[in-house]
Amino acid sequence: MKQKHLQVFGTVQGVGFRYYTQRLANKYNILGTVQNVDDYVEIYAIGNDDDLEQFINAVTEGASPASHVTHYELEDTNVSEDFSDFKSI
């Protein structure tokens, strides 16, 4: 399982972005978290290569109808927490 850290910038707070991200995570069998941080949304995502790629593409194309992603930063990470599901915090 690979682990990714994603920071998503743009109109991503107050528009249902975390809710839709959680739905996408369930669709693509992704574990981890999504949360609002300052002026962006932070996502820790764990899954297999294909599922992660599809999930990240869907999220960065705008997870919710009212969101608008201007840019994002993606990096590999090694989260020590053992996730059993995907949560919005």
UniProtKB/Swiss-Prot annotation:
Homology family: Belongs to the acylphosphatase family.
One Pfam family name is Acylphosphatase
**Occurrences of domain Acylphosphatase-like (ranges):** 3-89
Q: What is the enzyme's main class?
A: hydrolase
The record's EC number reads 3.6.1.7
The record's catalysed reaction(s) read: an acyl phosphate + H2O = a carboxylate + phosphate + H(+)
Protein name, entry field = Acylphosphatase
Q: Per UniProt, what is one GO molecular function of this protein?
A: zinc ion binding
| Alphabetized Gene3D superfamilies for the sequence | 3.30.70.100
> What gene is behind this protein?
acyP
Q: Which organism is it from?
A: Staphylococcus haemolyticus (strain JCSC1435)
Q: Which domain of life is it from?
A: Bacteria
Record-level GO BP terms: protein maturation
- Cite the entry's keywords alphabetically: Hydrolase
Q: Where is the active site?
A: R18, N36
Q: Does the keyword Metal-binding apply?
A: no
